């Protein structure tokens, strides 16, 4: 994930592209991803679950000649670019220029949001236009996303929050421990909003291993999950 087989105790430059610069980075468990200034995404590191998004399970960045311009761009779909990215232990999500979200990698708790437990990004023809948008509900787009260890959350365009994936310790914020996103009929309009309190809206979201926090529009923070 540092693009070398060596362990570094001081910072080293990661060569991602000769023509584009990175504008943000995100680190998952065994992998990392960068959002470039043209809206494209590149990922490297461990790839057992397809979390790099290249349609295989091949690690990248651990051998000579795998980084810089040799590192592929993640296929997000026809003319789609990313505005932000979030990486977790075994999956990655991108918030796209149209406000929709795509996720790939491990999906054992439905953390990708596709109403099943099938990994995405670890097989051929699973990325690009074949990778569906996460159904956030009728008419809703996202403005912020966060990926926890095995769950994902989004702040929607109305300031409300939705979360899906593992919920063993209440990290989804629904007052129960029921996983969501791993079965049919659990996403879209069926997925509830997190109750942030009367009149409260979120402006950004952050997810940890087993908990989640939201920054509210009044500058206060609310957190839920394992404590």
Residue ranges and their predicted role:
Residues 21, 28-29, 81, 88-89, ...:
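Beta-rich catalytic cores
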Residues 5-19, 73, 77-79, 128, ...:
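Trp- and S/T/G-rich repeat-edge/linker motifs of beta-rich repeat architectures
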Residues 37-40, 46-49, 77, 97-100, ...:
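Acidic glycine-/aspartate-rich tracts in secreted/extracellular proteins
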Residues 31-34, 43, 91-94, 103, ...:
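Conserved core positions of repeat-based scaffolds
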Residues 1-8, 13, 45-67, 105-127, ...:
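Short glycine/serine- and acidic-residue-enriched loop/turn motifs that recur at repeat junctions
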Residues 37-38, 56, 62, 66-69, ...:
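Asp/Glu-rich intrinsically disordered low-complexity tracts
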């Amino acid at each position: 994930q540092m693009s070398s087989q060596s362990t570094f105790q001081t910072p080293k430059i990661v060569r991602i592209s000769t023509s584009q610069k990175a504008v943000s980075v995100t680190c998952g468990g065994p992998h990392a991803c960068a959002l470039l200034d043209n809206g494209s995404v590149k990922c490297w590191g461990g790839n057992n679950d397809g979390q790099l998004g290249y349609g295989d399970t091949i690690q990248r960045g651990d051998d000579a000649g795998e980084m810089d311009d040799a590192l592929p761009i993640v296929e997000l779909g026809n003319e789609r670019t990313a505005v932000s990215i979030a990486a977790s232990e075994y999956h990655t999500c991108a918030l796209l220029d149209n406000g929709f979200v795509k996720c790939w990698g491990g999906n054992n708790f439905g953390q990708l949001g596709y109403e099943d437990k099938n990994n995405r990004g670890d097989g051929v023809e699973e990325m690009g236009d074949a990778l569906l948008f996460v159904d956030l509900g009728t008419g809703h787009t996202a403005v912020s996303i966060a990926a926890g260890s095995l769950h994902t959350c989004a702040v929607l365009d109305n300031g409300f929050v939705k979360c899906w994936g593992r919920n063993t310790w209440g990290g989804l914020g629904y007052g129960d421990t029921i996983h969501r996103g791993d079965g049919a009929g659990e996403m879209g309009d069926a997925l509830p909003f997190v109750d942030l309190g009367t009149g409260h809206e979120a402006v950004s979201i952050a997810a940890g291993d087993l908990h989640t926090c939201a920054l509210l529009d009044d500058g206060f923070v609310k957190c839920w999950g394992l404590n």
